[in-house]
Amino acid sequence: MKKKPIIIMTDSNSGIRQSEAKDLGIFVVPMPFTINDEEYFEDISISQEEFYEFLRQDATVSTSQPSQIYLEETWTNLLKEYEEVVFIPMSSGLSATCENAKNYAKSFDGKVFVVDNKRISCNMKESVFEAIALAKQGKTGSQIKAYLERTSNLFAVYIMVGTLKYLKRGGRISAAAAAIGSALNLKPILTTNGDKFEKVAMVLSVAQAKKKMIQKVKTDIETAFKNEYEKGTMTISVAHTENLAEAEKFKAEIMKELPNLKFRWVDPLSLSVSCHIGPGALAATLGNNAFMDQE
């Protein structure tokens, strides 16, 4: 049987569910993590609802990464049906999965291409959709990887953290700062360039946080992403952690304030991210997709 040219592969940090992956004709690696010393796989052995119930019970939660054996076996099986694999994991600055996968791929004779384009969540999902479009155009794995890495700076992420409890637990803020922040109901807004999360603002309410994030997006499309915005390729999505109702409201506010910006998705943040920030988070994610007309 003749092999198909290429398959796009990502991990569950993209927010793409297993059911959606089947519809798209791609492969999604379920990210592993440990809860109370037991291993779980996102969207396979645990649901979002079950995960947040564990968090409410103050379970011990830690993130992990796909094993070498798992990735190598997966690639071996995919290459029985496809000539090439393009793997788009979460940014190398936020997870060791990307660098490790690059090393594992060296033994696959140039048939596995690991992309590091600094993405996470809806921006990562946007990269997957671009990769799918490029594959349909007949581009090779090498060409897809080159394009995604060349355009890796065309994104922005702003996340309002709903509770300081999990930042404190992970050692990202001190106990004193968490106590003061919680007493004042402060909500930090974080951003990332793919290497680490940094605080860009501290606000007193969800309403203020949404306003601040929209302001940040407006600044981005007027400056750093002006050319892409004017071309009509910039997109925006909303992500959240167990905060769907507020996320839908945020979507409506964004569409009202930025009617010319293409809205894409309201998605839950991956459990790997939720481990560190807990429930109640809300995010605005700017991305770029030059091939939306081909979907």
Model-derived segments and spans:
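Mixed-charge interfacial surface used for oligomerization/domain docking
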Residues: 2-4, 13-27, 32, 84, ...
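Glycine-rich phosphate- or other oxyanion-binding loops that anchor nucleotides, phosphorylated ligands
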Residues: 58-100, 145-148, 152
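Short N-terminal secondary-structure initiator segments
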Residues: 42-71, 126-144, 232-237
